[in-house]
Each structure stands twice: as C-alpha cells, then as structure tokens.
Amino acid sequence: MIETGIYEQIINSLFKSKIESADDSAFFIENKKIGREEAATILSRYLFLKLAEQGFRVEASALTPKESKMALMLYYDMFDAAGRFESLQQMFDAFAADRLLVEEMKETVYEMRERCVAPEKEDNSALAFSMPLKVHGVYTKAQIQVAIGTNLINRKSSSREGCERNYDLGIEAMYVDIIKDWEEGSNTNYNDFALDRQAFHWETQNSVSPQSAIGQKYINKELHMLLFVRQQATVPEDKSRRMGYIYLGEVDLVSYEGSRPMRIVWRLRTPMAESTYSFAAKFKALG
C-alpha cells in the first residue's frame, strides 16, 4: 500500500504552483514548482490515462521500451530518488493496492486532459523509436535523464553540468539556461543563444578544444546532440532544479571556432517556436 496521504500530495502537486514543504513521509522534492498547464502536458505523456483506467493492474513486461521510459518518468516525477521500488512492476502493484489513489488519479487525469494544449511535434532525433520525448515539449531534468538512459529506477544521475552524455547510446543532452536578468560586466560569459529560429550558438565546457576527445566527437558528428533550453529570471545556483526545459530536438553541426571553449553553431532540424525564440535570441545564456 502507498503511505497514507500520498495521493493528496500527488494531486496537490499537480494543482499547486508550489508545495511549501514535504514531510518526512513524502517523496516529493520540497518547493516543487509545477503549474496546471505544465501538469496537463506532463500527464499526457505518462500513460496516466491508460494506467489509471486499468487501476494500475498492468504487466510492466508488456510495455514497449518507450512506454517503460514514460512510466519511469512518472516514477521520478513522484519520488525524485532512486530505489523507492525495485521495479516498475512493484510500483504499479503498490498503486493498484490503493483504491483511493487510483480514483483520485482518474478524476485528475480526465479533468486535466481537457485542458491540455501541447503544441508538440514528433521527435526528430535518431533515437525517436525509443525516447518518449516530443519536440517543443517541456520536461524536468529528471525526465530527460530517464529519456537518455542516465536515470534508472535503481540509480539516479548525479550530473550537475550543462551537458550530459550517454556514450552507450551515443547521446549528449545540452542543458541551456537562458538568463533574463544578468549583470553586465559579470565575470561569467553567457554566450549561448539563438541566432534565428533554426540556428543556435553554443559554447562547450572550458576544457574542450578541437583536438580533445570530446571536441573530435563534435567535429566528426559521433554523438546525437539534443538541445534543451529554459528561461531563468536569474543565474540558477542549482542546475538540477525541477523547472522545465523545452526540448528543441536533435541538432547538427554547422560550424565551429575557438578552443577552450569551442564556439559551435548548431542547426535545428525543427525550427523553434516563436515564443522560444523571443527569449532565446534576446537574452544571452548560461549553459
């Protein structure tokens, strides 16, 4: 059985912009920020409707690889830590045993499904067959890490960098924070920004040169480069915070120059939305 009261935390987290704090029995991160519209978009991805309608009485082994990742996204959105359950099946069984939780989820899903207006497009990456991401969709970092295979049910990624790689899959995720209010003259150079709706200027980490191993991978196009951007009011102290990134899809190398860091121009396979371009082009960024 799920701990008493956790269904209230689940529902409240979907309907409130902020949870003041979570008690020791809760599994939600403190001050989790998620609005109604974002929650509606998230719910549409998680198979919530399918799972809730069946009272979570499903066989995890029957899910496709993409559906399994969707379910693992659900796990991390609820618990935000590895090891709460040993398997997705154990999570489904625990949910199914709590009838009140199931009924609350059903009611919430139906209500928010009606509000969900998500201008998303099919994934354009080479890994679209297995990744549950939609271009222009909004995702937390934990959800992205599930998609690229660095978050597992028994292991959570410890990455706090502006990029994250899974060499087994040949993927690199670029996490770019677009800073709205940054101090002129700051020692930090914010040099990641949209050149137009289909071109993005990005700087590598300071250690990367064209001759370095990772620099060669960029030049030789050995990695599938996935671009994620989000707007921040100020410089974030913790890049792992659960604010959403907009997925701009796989990008391709156009040009590069410089060393430590390299300055790279990427071409987006799908043009970014005008609303994204309006902040990504106007403000410089922290990557």
Q: Model-flagged regions — what are they?
A:
Residues 1-133:
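C-terminal helical accessory/scaffold domains
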Residues 237-287:
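Compact mixed alphabeta submodule
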Residues 3-52, 134-244:
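Acidic, glycine-rich low-complexity segments with interspersed aromatic residues
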